[in-house]
Amino acid sequence: MKRKLASILSIIIFSIMFIGCFNYREINKITFATSIIFDRDEYDNVILYIDCVRPYRNANESSDKGRRIIFKGTGKTSLEAIREMNVKSSNRINFSQVRAYIFTEQAARKGVKKYIDLINNDQEFGFKPYMFTYFGDVNTLLDVTSSDEEYLGLYLDQLVEKNRSNAKVISANVNDYITKSLVANNISYMGAFIINDDALDKKIELNGGVIMKDNHMIDRLEQKDVVS
């Protein structure tokens, strides 16, 4: 597991260095989010969970070091939740390496426009990460994520890329989602996933998608309902 995490960490650090935005010293002062989970509570507060890597790289060393951290923040808005998480982190949290935006069923039903606006208005957030609705308990997802060998965002990104030729898999990144909304009377879609506990180990499994109207979830398409 440590070997695989080190390999993933090397990929993340290489991509950061490759785009030329950070040097070794700067990387050691930043925590990078690899995925964001958007949720809402019973009081309509925004709850954010981010799966992060805190890397460490020395120009004189050949190996990459770092550790995984999962933060939770709550606020009236996403920005308030992010500020709360930054207070808990000794390093600044950076969102330029996010690979997946994940919405709980409740967040998707209540509407995702404010989250899309956050992504659209902050240059740290990219338009290439895939969007998903997660059907299940967030704590279960966090437990599976914490015990797994791979970062949630990277795992979902690789899972979609591996299944691009599978007509049963629904996928959309932020750019796809917004473009579809503009040309289809505010109707769009995104992928969905569940935790499959039929096997000996609980595993994340892509499972259909959701139909969005005016940025609110109006229907769910399970994998068995998708026409191949």
What is each PLM-predicted segment?
Residues 2-228:
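Membrane-proximal alpha-helical signals and transmembrane carboxylates
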